[in-house]
From Swiss-Prot:
Swiss-Prot/TrEMBL GO biological process terms: cell division; cell wall organization; peptidoglycan biosynthetic process; regulation of cell shape
Classification via Pfam families: Glycos_transf_4 (PF00953), MraY_sig1 (PF10555)
The protein's name: Phospho-N-acetylmuramoyl-pentapeptide-transferase
Biological classification of the source: Bacteria, Bacillati, Bacillota, Clostridia, Eubacteriales
NCBIfam families cross-referenced by the UniProt entry: mraY
Gene name as annotated: mraY
Transmembrane segments: 3-23, 48-68, 72-92, 112-132, 141-161, 171-191, 193-213, 238-258, 297-317
Catalytically driven reaction(s): UDP-N-acetyl-alpha-D-muramoyl-L-alanyl-gamma-D-glutamyl-meso-2,6-diaminopimeloyl-D-alanyl-D-alanine + di-trans,octa-cis-undecaprenyl phosphate = di-trans,octa-cis-undecaprenyl diphospho-N-acetyl-alpha-D-muramoyl-L-alanyl-D-glutamyl-meso-2,6-diaminopimeloyl-D-alanyl-D-alanine + UMP
Amino acid sequence: MGVIIYSVLISFLFSILQGPLFIPILHKLKFGQPIREDGPKNHMKKAGTPTMGGIIFITTAIIAMIIMRKNLNSNAVFAFVCFFSFAMIGLIDDSLKILHKKNEGLTSKQKFLLQIIVSAAISYYAYIRFGSDTFIPFLKITWTLPPIVYMAAVVFYFVAVTNAVNLTDGLDGLASSVTILVVTFFTVVSFSWHQYELSVFCGIIVGILLGFLKYNSYPAQIFMGDTGSIGLGGAVAAIALVLKLPLLVIIVGGIYVIEVLSDIIQVSYFKLTGKRVFKMAPIHHHFEKLGWHETKVVSVFSIVTVILCLIAFLSLI
């Protein structure tokens, strides 16, 4: 347990120290976040807020992994590689947005293709390394999938989780707060299941986000960008996969799921009827339109995530 605490503290320290160094540089380089014109009007004041904060995640994770290398194994390295690979996709997307000076990076097809390629490589390695067993929450049984079905499911899973976390990153501190709770849950589970090295990696991610939240909470001084949100999605997906608990992400990451479903429902219903189900999607914007302040949305979504984590614990008992 002491090693996990060290991993949290080390990554927290390097994360929080990089803020004052990194944010002014991004300002000077004019690496500001373009704001979607059809979004909430009160978000327009955020235009120009530095983005690509996910670079802090990458540098801190690398430093922490090196420092904690004696307490890590191939499972932890696998989770890091997944995090890093998806963060690189996000970095490309963020770079293009800044280059174009608009909220337009990779096209949906380009981003989807890159995610498919990375996920396919991950799925093949995961099958070879971990097999195709998947734990079913509440039923407490293990389901063994045929190789092709397993690898296809893993591809879908990674693409879904990374995009879900990306969609959740729409309010100051929202994705950071929710993901801290989700990864803390997996820290406890991995430790209790004797996956000590993986729990150290989880601790690194938690520490990074705790430090970053100092600058990302309302009013945000920096955004994590796609570099951070897609990278975090890769980390969450990988951690759960190593534990053979990908289905549990549906529960602990319930906010991610709701964000995606609200977007799908909104688009599908509008195409069919020309009307909207929500005032705006993803659903965090719907609550803003109802008059909720950003901080209230983040607080309520975090509380919901705590409850979902408790339910998830019950599914494993």
